[in-house]
Amino acid sequence: ICLLLTYLLVVFLNLWKKLPQRLKTAAITGNFIVLLWVSGLMFFHSGFGNMISEFTKSGTVIDTATDTPLKVMDEVEDDSFYRSYARQKSATQGASMILEYNGVEYFNSTLAGPTVDFYREMGLTSWTLVKLMGFDERGYLDAMGNVKYMVMKEGKEFLLPYGFEEVKKILRDDVYYTVYENQNVLPLGYTYDQVISLENLENIETPFRQEVMLQAAVVDQPEKVPECQNVSDTGDGSIQISGQKIEITGIQCDENVTYDGSTIKATAADATMTLYFDGLEDSETYLYLKGLSMKKGKKATISFQVEDGKETQSYVVKGEANTYNTRQDEFLINLGYAQAKRVYCKIRFNQKMTIQLEDLAIYCQPMSPLTSYVDARKSDALENVSLETNRIIGTVQAQKNEFMVFGIPYQSGWSAYVDGVKTEIFRANIMYMGIHIGEGAHTIELRYEMPGLRISLVITAVSLVIFGCALILRKRGGRMQCKSE
């Protein structure tokens, strides 16, 4: 608005030719002073945004950026490849680069397409178009993503996902942190003898896809992986689905919420809506929202509570006009793992809002099958892994012809070699990489080279040659001109 008014003022002053120059100068000066005053209000006044309060204080940048529970991972002795996770604040999502640990949270203005596809297909809510924040603490996805450790501050144990066991307590900066180890983590490379196409995976309900992916590798063209059984659907018994859709037995809205089956309208802040159901024991429970959208408003927060009254999860709903709207159709809110079955979920709306949705449901994913799936994938795992700059080397003893998936995001620039022979890399499990391996002992090597690096070096060299030739010709031309004169 200020920019528009300034532009109109300049146009007006230019068109009014008879206006004295001193008045024009005074108008421009006055406009400049007003702009400074407005900027000051926006930066410092609490009623106009107080933008300065969001800035990091001088001298505290590193401390703020690394103020994550994962800062204690330097005291964990483990030479294997793994990733670590902790619930993070926005300011610490780049901490892994500073503290040099492998995490599952990062900020990047350009996320890779396969990664975006994975988060959408899995109904994940822990991401935006510019950042990833883990896998919603879903045990099946953590296993595939090599998430081996989770760190929590003391008193947050109720958020612990399935399969994590305490291995160490660490005192740092007068705060106790507990390190938990995932008992169901997969190694960097693991194998399958079954594959399924992405098209067929999409025919399976979103909450069940993660379980399928631990039994059959997802590839774009299964016919290119003939050594593995092509699982067309789950009806032939080769794929098991233990997850269940749970009937919602009741919905209770307080006086500030209405729900007609397609629209939820909250007319006041902290309005609540409670879903009642009879869940499953020893399960992760998910709230499934299909077609969730908010036509008006930029963003609004919804939080979710379960039996103990503690918030287990929250989600920021972004309006359709919001630049960072993920444009996904299905959302799975992880209400957490519990040994006892969950029986209700309270949804709290932090402000007035109206949201539309096509379906609202509860799903439960039993966790007992997870260990057997992981053990099957680990039977012929990548071993003796060596991580070097832009290079990964490991060995495998394959009992038969198989398909190996790596917990490395798929992107151009990677090349794979089996016993020194280059082999094709497939996009596997939507966002990861996979290759063929034959029966027997093999050495696997992965190399990374930034796409376009070689051609850019060639262009640079050619440009320097052209530039040098131009300088020489110009110098000779100058000499010839001097002689002629």
Which residue ranges define each predicted feature?
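Membrane-embedded transmembrane-helix bundle of lipid-linked glycan/lipid transferases
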Residues: 1-55, 442-443, 454-485
